[in-house]
Amino acid sequence: MSAASQRVGAFGEEAGYHKGLKPRQLQMIGIGGAIGTGLFLGAGGRLAKAGPGLFLVYGVCGVFVFLILRALGELVLHRPSSGSFVSYAREFFGEKAAYAVGWMYFLHWAMTSIVDTTAIATYLQRWTIFTVVPQWILALIALTVVLSMNLISVEWFGELEFWAALIKVLALMAFLVVGTVFLAGRYPVDGHSTGLSLWNNHGGLFPTSWLPLLIVTSGVVFAYSAVELVGTAAGETAEPEKIMPRAINSVVARIAIFYVGSVALLALLLPYTAYKAGESPFVTFFSKIGFHGAGDLMNIVVLTAALSSLNAGLYSTGRVMHSIAMSGSAPRFTARMSKSGVPYGGIVLTAVITLFGVALNAFKPGEAFEIVLNMSALGIIAGWATIVLCQLRLHKLANAGIMQRPRFRMPFSPYSGYLTLLFLLVVLVTMASDKPIGTWTVATLIIVIPALTAGWYLVRKRVMAVARERLGHTGPFPAVANPPVRSRD
């Protein structure tokens, strides 16, 4: 057997996975998996920059995030795969598209891991005992601990994410209850009256004008990143057709309550000027209301969120890198699988990239979070656009009688897909308008695109060789032993 066919194996990219995620774990990942540093830490700086109208941005972005998830849900039920939309890009647009989106998504999660290690170090330094420890050392310790846990098994990942997501959800619910009590009772916070009068006394709903609201959109998009993880995780659960629709449809309530509701409540409890970048707005609130130890307790929660996000990032990149490695687009070692069903090669590669973030914490500790956050947003925009494009392609092929769409579908397709792509383009343009960090981030595409192009020419012969081998073993679809049944009408 050739080297290519050995990599492909009898069942393609899904070989070796243990399908060990339980329904309750996937449900909780769907509910709380995306509640991470983008909300717990990033919302503080965005409130300070854009004002209370920020909750409207969360709402608008949330609508499109839900549409993206419905598109992903349709693709998953069309053909479950741990390679997620990288595998679907290969199916609908070919190897070149899978190569490009796979590496862009890897860039997203590699940068997200840097964001998370930076956030963990930032949270820890809120306590005096850790202020004497350099930020980069704290980031390195966090990476080492989470990497070790992630390499054990998918069951460990699922259990860690279940409890971490539960803690995050309970913490946000506690904030919503306490905040609502203060708001309904008109109790002052830090000497300020609560409610709509707070907005009137501090410049209204848009105190900094509409432009900052547009500019912070890329950061809000990052706050929603990881919602697509439910699609990746569905490839490692036994019955995705039963639990995927429930997990995705629960996103509507989660967006309305946890994202839009919490940001609106924060803006009604304290002036937007009370929040600041680098500090969780939830920690700010609990510290201001005088609850003894409440700020420290909330800091533990947001620390859990950052650790959870880092854990999820390593999980996701391991699976994505395994998928593109099985096609020949990534280094061979990233296709390696442990006996416990963990694609450790891709996970370790992500950890190595994250070490550059540790170095960034050493040289630019004050700017590390915003720099890599913007770079991460580029990857998630590419990933989400791919999901929508694949769904549109499935819709077109179904109309032509070539494929069949599952019952769980993206609503108002194809028009909702076109509108979502337009939204993502607007986000990219507004990111470029955020000088200097956002402008420089988008400018890095001048380097990224030629680098991806050059990389493709380096690996294309190997990719095509693997594709030819795979066609003889699994059909054109590497995720299943037999390609899906197609209509011949």
From Swiss-Prot:
It is found in: Cell membrane. One of its GO terms (cellular component) is extracellular region. It is a multi-pass membrane protein. Keywords: Amino-acid transport, Cell membrane, Membrane, Transmembrane, Transmembrane helix, Transport. InterPro entries: AA-permease/SLC12A_dom, Amino_acid_permease_CS. Its main location: membrane. The chain crosses the membrane at residues 25-45, 49-69, 100-120, 137-157, 162-182, 210-230, 255-275, 289-309, 344-364, 369-389, 413-433, 439-459. It comes from the Bacteria. The keyword Cell membrane applies. GO terms for biological process: amino acid transport; transmembrane transport. Belongs to the amino acid-polyamine-organocation (APC) superfamily. Amino acid transporter (AAT) (TC 2.A.3.1) family. This is L-asparagine permease 1. It comes from Mycobacterium tuberculosis (strain ATCC 25618 / H37Rv). The gene is ansP1.
